[in-house]
């Protein structure tokens, strides 16, 4: 089993980028989901309700993050924490009262114009503290603006198995980017990521925190921002439900980085171990 791909998404729900190597830090993959778009009340926005977010490119260069979109120009902000930046109180899922740094009026105006409502861009600073709430979490396990865990793992074999079923039902195969993974595996059986208690990648250890439940974002074309019908959720519902939670469907696995430092590279060997 090896690493087939590595991806980071600098701003939650905006476009991500493939990287040849990912550095692990206290919150997961460095640079991943360290920024968040929020409304005036501090509530987070995602593609679930704002599919146009899929049209915004993100580019990291040095200490800068640039957002751009066709016909909308671009805006650049710093990735470095700023003690002088005003703080915003933000909420994401079960976490409320999180303190994040406001990235300033230029980013807010650019995103507000693009999304058609008043929004703000915030970034993680030294006052940010968000513990992982999964049962597998240990004291001190933290994460950024991810949904459920610091690292989302999917295997190529799992996607192939899903697409085989979709095509058997007359549908079109879906690409990996619909699932917005961080780590893509190759050389393993379908859904092997679900069953691996621990993944070891050189000096980096990842701990399994359970299967990832999927939402309407998986039906959104990540290049055009269009909703494209009911797949893959319709097919996932036929074979990827949990009897204990029949309202959800699952694809990919949530992992917590037990290691708070280290580097993972495309092509690295991956070993599955018992807990």
Description of each model-found segment:
Residues 1-275:
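Metal-cofactor-dependent catalytic cores
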């Amino acid at each position: 089993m090896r690493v087939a791909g590595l991806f980071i998404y600098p701003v939650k729900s905006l476009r991500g980028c493939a990287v040849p190597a990912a550095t692990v830090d206290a919150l997961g993959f460095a640079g991943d989901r360290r920024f968040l778009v929020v409304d005036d009340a501090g509530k987070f926005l995602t593609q679930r309700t704002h599919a146009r977010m899929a049209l915004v490119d993100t580019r990291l260069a040095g200490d800068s993050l640039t957002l751009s979109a066709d016909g909308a120009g671009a805006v650049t902000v710093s990735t470095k924490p700023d003690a002088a930046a005003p703080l915003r109180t933000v909420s994401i899922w079960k976490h409320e009262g999180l303190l994040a740094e406001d990235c300033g009026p230029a980013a807010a105006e650019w995103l507000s114009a693009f999304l058609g409502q008043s929004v703000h861009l915030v970034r993680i600073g030294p006052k940010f503290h968000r513990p992982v709430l999964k049962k597998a979490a240990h004291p001190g396990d933290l994460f950024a603006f991810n949904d459920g865990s610091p690292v989302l793992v999917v295997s190529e074999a799992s996607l192939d198995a899903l697409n085989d079923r979709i095509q058997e039902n007359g549908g079109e195969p879906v690409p990996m980017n619909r699932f917005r993974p961080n780590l893509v595996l190759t050389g393993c059986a379908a859904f092997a990521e679900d069953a691996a208690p621990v993944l070891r990648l050189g000096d980096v250890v990842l701990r399994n925190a359970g299967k990832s439940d999927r939402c309407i974002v998986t039906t959104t074309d990540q290049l055009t921002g269009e909703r494209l019908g009911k797949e893959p959720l319709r097919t996932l519902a036929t074979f990827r439900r949990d009897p204990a939670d029949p309202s959800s469907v699952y694809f990919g696995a949530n992992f917590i980085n037990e290691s708070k430092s280290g580097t993972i590279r495309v092509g690295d060997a991956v070993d599955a171990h018992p807990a």
